[in-house]
Regions:
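N-terminal signal-anchor module of multipass membrane proteins
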Residues: 2, 14-85, 158, 183-190, ...
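Structural signature of hydrophobic alpha-helical transmembrane segments
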Residues: 59-71, 110-123, 183-192, 231-240
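C-terminal ends of transmembrane helices
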Residues: 75-88, 128-139, 199-206, 246-252
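Short, non-helical or kinked segments that cap or interrupt transmembrane helices
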Residues: 86-101, 141-145, 211-212, 216, ...
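Membrane-interface helix-loop-helix junctions at boundaries between adjacent transmembrane segments
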Residues: 92-166
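Loop-to-transmembrane alpha-helix initiation sites
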Residues: 117-118, 141-150, 236-241, 277-289
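Long hydrophobic alpha-helical segments that form multi-pass transmembrane helix bundles
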Residues: 143-195
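Central hydrophobic cores of alpha-helical transmembrane segments
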Residues: 150-154, 213-221, 259-271, 286-289
């Protein structure tokens, strides 16, 4: 999973405002809402129902990973609470979503040992602190959003020094719908089409427009991989998840539909380059694609004289 071969408006950010469906009454206590929002924030949504479907996707398709995902999310949330970080941001899931992905990655990539749970807790807590530093510096002058950068940086560090467990790739059905579903499932390191279906339902409940863009991104990514002769990667969804995330990041720019399309194209183009790294690229193509677009948007909005001045600052 997430290997290269199987063997917001102008500044896209994670959601901090409620995005609940119409007439939805949230029955969860605050801590559960924060956790579920952490799962949905992986998809750049704030919606506990969406988060619940993401949780179910993991539970039904890879139950052995659910403990790591919950542990990573809890570590991020409790670290934020212990350190007195902004409560609104905690409830929005901003301190949990990187922990979710870190818990999934470490549970999948590393063999079980007594050190694995403490490692997930430490990595999840560290991701929370990195997000906080990023949020502290956010403002009018902040160009780049954090996205899943803490997850990627911590994940790369652990994979470089750790000893990943052996994994075998099962034969995949050459089915276009299954490939599309896997493209969404791989966002959570899941290669089961059922996982992708549940994630798609969660996205539809949170934001139908965003769901449509995510599906389009996954479809374009898989199609490009097929055309490029990467059939195995295409049917595994490995060219779909970064494109889907890039589309989600710019899906709210309704008056500029070319932005999510450009984000999708950049994410797909960057994926083969990042495949040359000694570790899996994870969500780095998505992050870099969005950062390039954000830098470009900032440069275009800045007056020419001011841009020239900044070259020497």
């Amino acid at each position: 999973m997430w290997d290269q071969q199987p063997k917001e408006a102008p500044h896209a950010t994670h959601q901090t405002a409620p995005m609940y469906t119409k007439n939805f009454v949230n029955p969860c206590p605050d801590w559960a809402t924060a956790l579920l929002n952490g799962f949905s924030q992986v998809l750049l949504q704030r919606n506990p129902l969406c988060g619940l479907f993401c949780l179910l996707a993991i539970l039904f398709s890879a139950p052995e990973l659910i403990g790591g995902a919950l542990l990573g999310a809890l570590a991020g949330l409790l670290t934020a609470q212990r350190r007195g970080y902004n409560r609104v941001d905690r409830q929005a899931g901003l301190y949990s979503y990187n922990g979710v992905l870190i818990g999934l990655l470490l549970s999948h990539a590393l063999p079980w040992s007594a050190i694995l749970p403490p490692l997930i807790i430490a990595a999840g807590g560290l991701s929370s602190m990195l997000v906080h530093q990023w949020l502290k510096r956010s403002g009018p002058q902040q160009v780049l959003s954090a996205f899943t950068a803490p997850f990627v940086l911590i994940g790369w560090a652990v994979l470089l020094v750790g000893e990943p467990g052996a994994s075998s790739a099962a034969p995949l059905e050459h089915n276009a719908l299954y490939a599309l579903a896997r493209g969404l499932g791989q966002i959570f390191l899941l290669d089961n089409p059922l996982a992708g279906l549940l994630i798609a339902i969660g996205l539809l409940l949170a934001n139908r427009y965003a769901a449509a863009w995510a599906l389009l991104g996954a479809a374009i990514g898989g199609s490009v991989a097929l055309i490029g002769g990467e059939a195995s990667a295409a049917y595994a969804g490995l060219y779909g998840f970064n494109a889907a995330l890039a589309a989600l990041a710019f899906s709210q720019t309704r008056r500029q539909p070319w932005l999510p399309l450009l984000a999708i194209s950049l994410a797909i183009a960057l994926q083969p380059l990042l495949a040359q790294l000694p570790v899996p690229g994870l969500t780095a193509p998505f992050i870099l694609a969005c950062w390039l677009l954000q830098i470009g948007q900032r440069a275009l909005r800045q007056p020419l004289g001011r841009r020239a001045d900044r070259l020497h600052s």
